[in-house]
Amino acid sequence: MNTNEVTLIDDLLSNEENLALINKLCYHQWYLTKCLDYGNLISPLFAGRGGGFSVSSLEDGKPFNSPLNKEAYKITEKVCEQLNIKKYEIKRFLWNMYFPRNHTEFHKDEYTDDFLSILYNPHTTDGGTFINNKFYVDKISQAKVYKSMVEHKGNPPSKDSVRFNLNVLIKCFK
């Protein structure tokens, strides 16, 4: 995969699986996302510039006991199969929840060439993701796959009430 390339993979989960996943996400415990430009979470939250909410279900290659991991593993396996990635290690499952007016920053998930980011959308929203300064709107059951060292940022919804996604970080081996 080239550094500036974004691969879109559709129809990873059925509509029923996505609805069940969203139901799990609605009842899951969430944490305020740390904003890169603030040392304190309270000020940006009350100023309407909070970064949304997130929760990890796998960190540094170690899974947590989470009801979200079943779908995350399935999505990761399907993406790697379609991209013919045979040897990889899952480093992170990070779930995000955004509301209108949330503030996000451009960032990199990793800094070396051997990592890929998989961004999965369980529903269609008017939010999306900027990758290499190009906007990709959320589409139900679609994954956006790109080099983790590429700058990107989530974009909250403006008309839709909430936006969920899964960010998977994998290390690929040759």
Language-model regions: role of each:
Residues S56, G61-K174:
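Catalytic core of non-heme Fe(II) oxygenases with the double-stranded beta-helix
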Residues M1-K87:
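Non-heme Fe(II)/2-oxoglutarate
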